[in-house]
């Protein structure tokens, strides 16, 4: 299916997979993929229950079916067959009445320089799973429970080569920030520019934090917004869940579902609410906001007047660029102008980029070096 899948203004997703399968006998310490493939009837029955409750998009149970997660159970080389078979179970459940989303999630890797894993390795892991999901025939990709912008970027880059929609949902903490500490609005702007087709939140904190985050980002969003709240303290009563779903719609979400703790009954309650829902007007951007140039890193968002951008003098890349970054901040310039002459320059900049407070702008006469810098940053 192509990337122009028609999505209704209000679309209902499914609810939790793992917590419902725990109730069906799956243990938290065993490989979920092996358990599901040895209990296909349980997986199909759960999917069909969501379908009957009103879900129009079912997530294939491929959440942790990437090489890094499967390696814990000696299955790193089985990414393709495991994803293919799990998508097949979702297809049986949907019976042609719902779209199937290929589900990608965090790998558990720790990226350089704080960790030992490279961004290239992260991209390879997601590329392998995305290829398997595409071959299995998913209708769209959902990259969910993302903890940080870099990992979300890697997954988006892996999925984007296929002509299918790519959705991303981030996990929030109790302060309404990304679990990495990043700002939801900065994340939205970054991923929109990467070409995602929908953006939002799942898991992490509960619906209250999602309502706040949605109200913050909805005036700026040019893609549909997703809300799939989890309930770590226990699933609420059905009427409470339906009311929370309504509040998420009022805050700007158009695609809703449930995460940890949400059952088919909860999705049914949200479906009943949707049949009576009256859309609320959203606050527009001011004309000044519409004309701004928006720049982001994971922690901050910068709005610049395109006629008044103050650049630094060209900054050459090197092993330690922190003094240059501090000087740009001290001089109160708007943007650092960074010279990228070789692919190694791109590596040098990426290695220190976490220390940069001022936005960066690359210039280069070498297309390969510039492409590498954009890829890493």
State the predicted function of each range.
Residues 1-377:
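Domain-level signal for soluble alpha/beta catalytic cores
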């Amino acid at each position: 299916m192509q990337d122009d899948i028609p999505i209704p203004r209000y679309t209902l997703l499914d609810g939790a997979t793992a917590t419902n399968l725990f109730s069906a006998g799956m243990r938290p310490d065993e490989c979920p993929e092996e358990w599901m493939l040895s209990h296909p009837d349980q997986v199909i029955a759960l999917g069909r229950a969501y379908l009957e409750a009103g879900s129009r998009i079912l997530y294939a149970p491929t959440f942790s079916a990437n090489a890094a997660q499967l390696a814990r159970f000696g299955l790193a080389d089985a990414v393709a067959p495991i994803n293919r078979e799990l998508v097949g179970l979702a297809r049986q459940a949907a019976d042609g009445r719902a779209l199937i989303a290929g589900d990608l999630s965090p790998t558990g890797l720790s990226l350089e320089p704080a960790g030992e894993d490279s961004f290239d390795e992260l991209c390879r892991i997601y590329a392998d799973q995305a290829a398997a999901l595409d071959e299995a025939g998913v209708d769209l990709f959902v990259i969910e429970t993302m903890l940080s912008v870099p990992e979300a970027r890697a997954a988006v880059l892996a999925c984007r080569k296929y002509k299918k929609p790519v959705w991303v949902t981030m996990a929030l903490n109790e302060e309404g920030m990304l679990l990495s500490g990043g700002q939801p609005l900065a994340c939205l702007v970054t991923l929109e520019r990467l070409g995602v087709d929908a953006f939002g939140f799942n898991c992490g904190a509960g619906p209250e934090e999602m309502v706040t985050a949605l109200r913050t980002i909805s005036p700026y969003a040019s893609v549909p917004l997703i809300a799939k709240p989890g309930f770590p303290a226990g699933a609420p009563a059905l009427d409470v869940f339906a009311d929370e779903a309504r509040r998420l719609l009022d805050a700007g979400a158009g695609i809703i579902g449930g995460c940890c703790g949400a059952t088919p009954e909860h999705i049914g309650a949200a479906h009943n609410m949707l049949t009576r829902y009256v859309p609320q007007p959203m606050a527009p951007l001011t004309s000044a906001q519409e004309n701004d140039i928006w720049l982001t890193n994971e922690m901050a968002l910068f709005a610049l007047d395109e006629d008044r951008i103050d650049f630094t003098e060209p900054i050459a890349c090197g092993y330690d660029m922190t003094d240059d970054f501090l000087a740009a901040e001290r001089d109160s310039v708007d943007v650092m102008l960074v010279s990228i002459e070789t692919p190694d320059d791109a590596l040098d900049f990426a290695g220190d980029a976490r220390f940069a407070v001022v936005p960066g702008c690359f210039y280069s006469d070498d297309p390969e070096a510039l492409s590498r810098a954009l890829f890493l940053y």
